[in-house]
Regions:
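Reverse-transcriptase-like RNA-dependent polymerase core
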Residues: 183, 188-213
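Short, flexible loop/turn elements at secondary-structure junctions
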Residues: 16, 136-140, 158-160, 175-179, ...
Length: 345
């Protein structure tokens, strides 16, 4: 059998206990007999007649409907389902819209398809910097339904400054930031998860000053505390400092950033910047050749904890520094072998 990827919370399973036929199980039962909800494969993913991107005026988008299937679609950024609008003919897109579609095999042999997503920008919605369109259920007010610690599925599309489509991916998202969540342009984290069946990473060179071309995690922020509504903000301080550190080779853990315009479920959400996520094992693998199980990563916010690995070596060093005479050259030289002094200056 050709066992490929599955959608979230699905699995490949034997069609009958001990049988030789494998099928997609949409309601997995680990260590128990497989029940109903078994399918040969997935229905064909819908195909749109027009590419995602910027258009001077409105357009009519047709969707290819495979024989024996029906297509359901949404225009509000939400994931379509069996109760969404039935596709019966070309869809008129008069304003900036996130069009999402799913197909259903009317015979019941195949499970519902993967979701196709295209964002169409029309008329005055054109920009001189790159644009990112994010879409998902319940995100149009800038608040994630799951709240703090809650992950919500998100589709993300990147467009070049000239309006051409660049790359897309599907993953999870959650709220990011602390004080900056007091205003409308909230920050969020995006995480590509291969277990959702779409992508394992955003595969594109997203930053002009770095050659990195695969990203599982990104942070989106509207300048954070340099954008408070109750005091003047430059909107660039943090990004500027990180970029300066990179160009001056200051030996710091810079979060490379890039300015962009964000649209959320088709709504203009303003100027943001997206950044690398430092507490991401892909970050340490890329820049330090230290993959998971080979790095200790500690974080501090109101307390200190180990994000990866162990904190034993760090606490041993802290105890040495706080208990020994650091004016002694030998002690200082020893500590200098355990960390990069320039990164602390």
């Amino acid at each position: 059998s050709n066992i490929g990827t599955t959608q979230a919370d699905h699995s490949w399973a034997r069609d009958t206990d001990g049988g030789s036929i494998w099928a997609i199980c949409t309601n997995p039962t680990p260590e128990a007999s497989n029940g109903a909800d078994m399918f040969s494969s997935y229905a064909m993913t819908p195909v749109f007649s027009d590419e995602a991107g910027f258009y001077a005026g409105g357009l009519n988008v047709a969707i290819n409907v495979p024989v024996g299937h029906e297509v359901r679609y949404t225009t509000d950024g939400y994931a379509p389902n069996a109760g969404s609008m039935l596709y019966t003919g070309a869809i008129n897109v008069a304003t900036t819209t996130v069009l999402r579609a799913i197909s259903f095999d009317l015979s019941g042999v195949n499970a519902p398809s993967y979701i196709a997503t295209n964002t169409y920008f029309t008329g005055a919605d054109s920009h001189t910097i790159s644009v990112v369109s994010v879409s998902g259920n319940g995100q149009e007010d800038g608040e994630w339904p799951g709240g703090w610690g809650g992950d919500e599925p998100m589709h993300i599309e990147f467009f070049n400054a000239n309006g051409s489509f660049r790359v897309e991916a599907t993953g999870d998202s959650n709220e990011h930031g602390n004080d900056s969540n007091a205003y409308g342009q909230r920050g969020f984290d995006y995480v590509t998860r291969d277990q959702m069946g779409y992508d394992y990473a955003i595969e594109a060179q997203l930053f002009a000053i770095k050659d990195r071309n695969k990203f599982q995690r990104l942070i989106f922020k509207a300048a954070a505390n340099d954008n408070y509504p109750f005091e003047p903000g430059a909107h660039i301080r943090d990004s500027y400092v990180h970029t300066l550190s990179h160009k001056a080779d200051l030996k710091l853990d810079e979060r490379t950033s890039e300015s962009c315009i964000v649209y959320l479920n088709g709504l203009y959400w303003g100027v943001y910047d997206y950044r690398e996520k430092v507490d991401d094992i892909d970050f340490t693998t890329k820049y330090y050749d230290q993959p998971r199980h080979f790095v200790d990563f500690l974080k501090t916010w109101g307390g200190t904890w180990e994000e990866y690995g162990s904190g034993n070596d760090w606490y041993t060093l802290v105890n040495f520094v706080t208990s020994q005479d650091m004016t002694d050259a030998a002690n200082y030289d020893y500590v200098a072998t355990q960390l990069h002094p320039l990164s602390l200056i």
